[in-house]
């Protein structure tokens, strides 16, 4: 069995080498104090049945050091979303129904929201987002000024978990970030064409010139289409990590919601990663199974060194934790038991593949969307 031990050691070592390459380029927000004696920007929040989440976001907006307008686009909510939003002083606008079925997801709400914005700068922020610091919005504006106040800036929030099951989102969140290509030196350095969806910042002129969310009207995950629309107009598209300024808590409704959410995400947004980066990601993930396989076999066969296999597993686990700490706060127990996370990720990936290629339909928040029609 020594030969198998050597093979597994080589596989895990190669896997960790890939892990060192998939997220070795950082894109972090730079803070700077700015002075505004007028509204700095308009924050547009698309919301559908968000009464349990939107209050945290609105409270964090009130704490910001720069003055902003807040518009909550109420997209057919049947709960108290509108009442909660108004209690924080936000302007609530009911989304006009899409009777023609030409729009998917939140793009319809976002596009309508821009018509109510009073400032040139506009930011689209999901209802489950929270600004962690009082200078968070100020930092976003500063970063946007550094790119000449042109194009599109987007942020992937730091993922905060509170219940054990929420940690099963770990790999998905990491893949969302590294799958954008620009966080790896394996990227060829060409113009970025993709954007994160939870937090985006732009200006009205560029928004309307590119078509804005109209370019993503048939997309459930709008970031890729939005980024491509800006790139096609030779406008810059930038992506940043959220920590320590922006965070979100996902799928707090329960484990079923988590499964449905990530199935939707993979069904519609897994095609933008470049082949060599995707290959490195797959090889890195395979190291999780290879390391636990070596550990289990060493406990059964004396020819394999238990000490060596334990060291191999711990080495991979250390890197696994290190990479995930950049994107979120997850259960230490789940991090150590990463093969469980890998198996869950595989299950959802297969499930999303079936929905995309066999059924052509994905369901989210009580609405069904045809994947086969998404362009």
Curated annotation (Swiss-Prot):
One Pfam family this sequence matches: Glycos_transf_2
Keywords from the named record: Carotenoid biosynthesis, Cell membrane, Glycosyltransferase, Membrane, Transferase, Transmembrane, Transmembrane helix
EC number(s) from the headed UniProt entry: 2.4.1.-
GO MF term list: glycosyltransferase activity
Entries under InterPro entries matching the protein: Glyco_trans_2-like, Nucleotide-diphossugar_trans
Ranges annotated as spanning the membrane: 3-23, 164-184, 277-297, 330-350
Membrane disposition: Multi-pass membrane protein
Any single GO CC term annotated in Swiss-Prot or TrEMBL for this entry: plasma membrane
Enzyme's top EC category: transferase
UniProt record, GO biological process: carotenoid biosynthetic process
Pathway: Carotenoid biosynthesis; staphyloxanthin biosynthesis; staphyloxanthin from farnesyl diphosphate: step 4/5
Main location: membrane
Superkingdom per UniProt: Bacteria
Coiled coil regions, renumbered to chain: none
Cellular compartments annotated: Cell membrane
Family: Belongs to the glycosyltransferase 2 family. CrtQ subfamily.
Protein's job: Catalyzes the glycosylation of 4,4'-diaponeurosporenoate, i.e. the esterification of glucose at the C1'' position with the carboxyl group of 4,4'-diaponeurosporenic acid, to form glycosyl-4,4'-diaponeurosporenoate. This is a step in the biosynthesis of staphyloxanthin, an orange pigment present in most staphylococci strains.
UniProt name for this protein: 4,4'-diaponeurosporenoate glycosyltransferase
Gene name of the record: crtQ
């Amino acid at each position: 069995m020594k030969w198998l031990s050597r093979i597994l050691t080589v596989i895990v070592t190669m896997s960790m080498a890939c892990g060192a390459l998939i997220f070795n380029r950082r894109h972090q927000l730079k803070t700077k104090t700015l002075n505004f004696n007028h509204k700095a920007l308009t924050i547009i929040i698309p919301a559908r049945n968000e009464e349990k989440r939107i209050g945290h976001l609105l409270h964090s907006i009130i704490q910001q050091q720069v003055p902003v307008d807040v518009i909550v686009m109420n997209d057919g909510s049947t709960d108290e979303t509108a009442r909660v939003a108004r209690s924080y002083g936000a302007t609530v606008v009911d989304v006009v129904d899409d009777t023609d079925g030409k729009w998917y997801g939140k793009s319809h709400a976002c596009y309508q929201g821009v018509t109510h914005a009073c400032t040139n700068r506009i930011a689209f922020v999901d209802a489950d987002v929270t600004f962690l610091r009082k200078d968070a919005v100020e930092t976003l504006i500063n970063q946007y000024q550094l790119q000449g106040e042109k194009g599109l800036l987007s942020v992937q929030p730091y993922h905060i978990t509170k219940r054990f099951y929420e940690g099963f989102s770990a790999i998905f969140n990491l893949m969302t970030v590294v799958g954008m290509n620009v966080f790896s030196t394996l990227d060829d350095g060409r113009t970025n064409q993709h954007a994160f969806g939870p937090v985006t910042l732009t200006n009205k002129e560029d928004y309307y010139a590119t078509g804005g969310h109209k370019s993503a009207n048939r997309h459930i995950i709008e970031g890729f289409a939005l980024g491509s629309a800006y790139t096609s107009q030779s406008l810059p598209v930038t992506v940043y990590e959220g920590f320590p300024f922006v965070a979100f808590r996902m799928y707090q409704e329960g484990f079923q919601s988590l499964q449905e959410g990530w199935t939707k995400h993979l069904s519609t947004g897994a095609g933008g990663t470049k082949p060599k980066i995707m290959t490195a990601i797959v090889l890195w993930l395979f190291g999780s199974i290879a390391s636990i396989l070596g550990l289990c076999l060493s406990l059964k066969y004396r020819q394999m060194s238990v000490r060596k296999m334990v060291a191999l597993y711990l080495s991979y686990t250390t890197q696994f934790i290190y990479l995930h700490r950049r994107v979120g706060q997850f259960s230490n127990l789940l991090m150590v038991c990463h093969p469980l996370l890998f198996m869950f990720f595989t299950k959802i990936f297969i499930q999303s593949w079936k929905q995309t290629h066999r059924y052509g339909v994905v369901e989210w928040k009580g609405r069904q969307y045809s994947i086969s029609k998404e362009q």
